[in-house]
């Protein structure tokens, strides 16, 4: 959007955070409402994903390492944009890792004058390209693989394990979580998430939450 906001960014609902559910368990995760409907793309399109990390806890901390797991038909774009954010590509080109946020403190939760819990966050973008032979739905999964407390000491997240995401097979990726409906579709834990694009079935020129497709904001 012209004001710098993203139409696919989550609307955060913290009304149940840190309350007790019907089973007597503490609710440790906010609700993040945002569409997971695949964005239409064409072959060779450039896609920018924004990876945003929220702090839902009572301690300041750092998302020291983040990994993005690239699916078939989506490739990393070498160049100044991704270099700025410290992305490093694995030998097979399927996993990209950054420590860009390791010095960016994500502050603990606060409460406003009305008692509403407010979450702080930090974010890092990654630029990818839809391959020339792409087809169908393309699912991109990212997760936090290392977190540290305000003193830079390794810390255990209260409701998720680092580097614990189970990646679907390439055959299963296109339909990943398609059976889950609604505005809030959580990841496997609260430190991973996904987004999808779908290649248009009609091709003229045919040239992962998503903020920009080939220099045009997603609406």
Residue ranges and their predicted role:
Residues 1-219:
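Exported/extracytosolic protein signature
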């Amino acid at each position: 959007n012209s004001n710098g906001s993203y139409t696919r960014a989550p609307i955060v609902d913290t009304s149940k955070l840190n309350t007790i559910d019907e089973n007597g368990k503490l609710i440790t995760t906010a609700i993040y409402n945002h569409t997971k409907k695949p964005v239409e793309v064409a072959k060779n399109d450039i896609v920018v994903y924004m990876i945003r990390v929220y702090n839902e806890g009572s301690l300041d901390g750092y998302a020291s390492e983040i990994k993005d797991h690239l699916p078939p038909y989506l490739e990393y774009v070498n160049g100044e944009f991704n270099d700025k954010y410290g992305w490093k590509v694995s030998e097979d080109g399927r996993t990209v890792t950054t420590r860009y946020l390791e010095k960016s403190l994500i502050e603990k939760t606060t409460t406003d004058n009305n008692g509403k819990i407010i979450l702080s966050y930090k974010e890092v973008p990654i630029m990818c390209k839809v391959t020339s032979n792409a087809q169908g739905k393309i699912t991109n999964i990212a997760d936090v693989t290392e977190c540290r407390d305000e003193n830079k000491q390794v810390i255990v997240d209260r409701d998720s394990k680092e580097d614990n995401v189970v990646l679907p097979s390439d055959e299963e990726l296109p339909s990943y979580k398609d059976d889950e409906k609604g505005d809030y579709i959580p990841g496997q834990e609260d430190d991973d998430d996904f987004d999808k694009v779908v290649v248009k079935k009609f091709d003229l020129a045919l040239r992962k939450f998503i903020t920009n497709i080939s220099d045009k904001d997603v609406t």
